[in-house]
Amino acid sequence: MVRKTVYTLVVIVLQMGEERVVFAREKPEVSVQYTIELQSDFGRRLNWVNLLSLRATVPMEWLGLWGNGKLEVQAISVYKTSRERIAGDRQVFSNIEEDNLPFSPFILGYSQQIGKVLLFGGLRNVNEDYFTTPYASLFTNSSCGIYPTLSANYVLANYPLSAVCLHLEYRINEKIGIKNSLYNGKAYLPFERGSSIFTVAPRRDGLLDLAEISYTTNNSYHGTYNLGVVVHGSNRFGDASDCRLPSEQVQAQTEVSSAKHWRVNYACWLSAEQECWRSGRYSAGVLGQYSFAPSDRNDCRRYVAAGGVFRGMLSASQEDALGVIFSQASFSDVREKALEITWNYTVSDHFTVQPAFHFIRTGNERYHIAMLRVVVSY
């Protein structure tokens, strides 16, 4: 009788242990984010921009296979009411405004964690891994999300474009990390005749590689410092407008250029964010950004920005952030200065509201923009 009781208890414990293992497995995750943005140049013109993002991750362990790996899928759709932008600024004051785009693959690939190393292969975009620091992510100007020394000089996988990529991340320790991303040298618009976002053509498009080392402070004050470089090699140089050319036209231009001359282009960047003060719910910090590219082969040669972020100033909790940033971009034909003042308030875990004001001077042209962004996510 005693043996039977002990045996029964052992079976129960083993079954409970098995259940714990099952419940500990990662489950698939699905998220939806809808962003609405209203833009106005103070009464003359209006624009309404919509961005819908659907994302899913499926752990391999959930499929009964190995651990620490997952399939990643994300699709986006963009719609706006005005075909023309309400401002002619070069840096682009809205980081979500693009031409209308039906659902398009944004991320599609497989990632594997091996110790301190993360590997990814598939369709990807640079917005997933670079220029995503906490302070910079607050602002709505496109230059804060990716510097114009990259977005204006390369046809790279920048929102809403994606390209085939091999991505690697390595955490040296809790403070220092390294990233490297190797992309096809040109990103293509989806659903365009004669082009494919899954194109891998180094001979025609070249190769584009991004590398970055980051340092994060591990004390009570948040701080992030990044140093990066992008290198592009191909038979021809292009700019961001090339993404609207069909691949046949790009091929023809490539054949005209000498195949014997493999040309290299590059840009470097440096960014710093540091929280400087904290008292109760209040906190304040500063950020700085700088990037340069060779002036003899690029449209945008210099970019510099500086600003501050203040939390808890306008609400009873730290669910709000007030940001001010000034940026200057030097292009081959004009210099542009932009000032953004924005406030982001998190109403709930699923709802945020963010008004922003942009004051821009592009050469002799001036633009004043007011916008309201609302984000709903689940």
For each predicted feature, which ranges?
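Cleavable N-terminal export/targeting peptides
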Residues: M1-R25
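Short loop/turn motifs that connect adjacent beta-strands in outer-membrane beta-barrel proteins
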Residues: V21-E29, F42-G43, T57-L71, K116, ...
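Transmembrane beta-strand segments of Gram-negative outer membrane beta-barrel proteins
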Residues: F23-D41, L71-V73, T81, S142, ...
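Membrane-embedded beta-strand positions of outer-membrane beta-barrel proteins
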Residues: V30-V32, L71-A75, L119-G121, L168, ...
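Membrane-spanning beta-strands of outer-membrane beta-barrel proteins
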Residues: V49, F103, L161, G206-L208, ...
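Outer membrane beta-barrel
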Residues: S53, V58-G185, N298-G307, R311-D333
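Outer membrane beta-barrel transmembrane domains
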Residues: R193, I197-P202, E212-S214, G228-W262, ...
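Outer-membrane beta-barrel "beta-signal"
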Residues: R366-Y378
